[in-house]
Every structure is written in C-alpha cells, then in structure tokens.
Amino acid sequence: MKISETKNRIIETASFLFYKNGYNATGINEIIAEAGIAKATLYNHFKSKEALCLAYLQFKNTTFIKGIEVYTRSKPKGKDQILAIFDFLGIFFQNKDFNGCWCIKTVSEIPKDNEVIRSEIQLQKNNFIDLISKLIMDNLDHFSEKEVTSLARQIYLLYESAVGESHLHQADWPIKETKNLCSQIIN
C-alpha cells in the first residue's frame, strides 16, 4: 500500500473516531486497531496525537469547504446562494453521523494554552467567514465593504448557532429558523 493511502486511511479513521467519540475519548490504540496498522506506522506519519488532530481538523474542513462551495454555486445567483449554506447544513444534519461542529467539539476538549490546535480552528472559522463574505459580494451589490464584513460575521454566528442547537435538540428547527432570520437580515 502506498504511503499516501496509509496516511489517508489513518486520517479518515481518526476523523471518524474523533468526531464520533471526541478527541480525548479516542485513544491512539483505538485508531491503530480501526485503521488496521502498526503503532510504528501511525508514528511514521504523525509524530503525536496533536499532529493527528491537526490532520483531522484540516481533513474535515477541506471536505466541508469543498462541499459547501459546490452546493452554493449550484443555486441561482442572489439570496439563494447565501441561504444555501443553511440548506447544506440541513443535509449535513440529516446524515446519521451528524454530531455537531468538529471544531467546537475539539476546542472544548483541549487545554486553553494549546495554541497549535486553537489557531487552526480559528483559521478555519475565519476562512468560513471569508467564504460567506465572498458569497455576499458575489450575490448582493447593495452593501459596502464594512457592511459585508459585519453581515458575514452575523451570518456566521447564525450558522454556528444552528449547528450547535440542531445537535443539542436533535432537530432541524434551529436550521430552518436561522435560515429565516438570515433571509430577513440580507434584504
């Protein structure tokens, strides 16, 4: 098996387990057993559990960003492309493996002084705000740059709330309500 295939299998296995069970609740031995590899193989690819956590966060984020970009672009130009982020979340919520936000789950489990993981999560969240800003600029022309920044942050906060509350309540009404609220604020 190629090195990249092995590394990808380790990342995919760790991603599944970290997201399902939590970062702290998932041990290295569990990842090794699930991936069907030797301990030395894991440590040839990742020097620590923290390095594997970074790969997990990056894997989840890359998959998410690609998916949401394709999905939003498939919608008609205008408000629909912006509101589509909530429809995308609704589809994600319907997945039997939905377990909330991988970033928030992870940051809640790490020590406050773990700047490596915290910085990666902040970067991902800021990149999502940038994606929302781009959606606004590409689809709505009546906002100034300053207004776009503020609006993107507001939509981001609505989205994050919808993720957390839909997970908590195990229902999609938070997604529907935040989409309705977003529709009102982008008019």
Positions of the model-derived regions?
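Hydrophobic alpha-helical connector segments
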Residues: 55, 69-95, 151-155
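Amphipathic alpha-helical packing segments from all-alpha helical-bundle domains
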Residues: 80, 114-139
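Hydrophobic/aromatic-rich alpha-helical bundle segments in the mid-to-C-terminal region
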Residues: 117-124, 139-184
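Basic, helix-initiating cap at the start of DNA-binding domains
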Residues: 1-21, 25-37, 51
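Short hydrophobic/aromatic patch on the recognition helix
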Residues: 36-46
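Amphipathic alpha-helical segments used for helix-helix packing
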Residues: 95-115
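A secondary-structure capping/hinge motif
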Residues: 50-52, 106
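Short, basic, alpha-helical segments at the C-terminal edge of helix-turn-helix-like DNA-binding modules
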Residues: 58-65
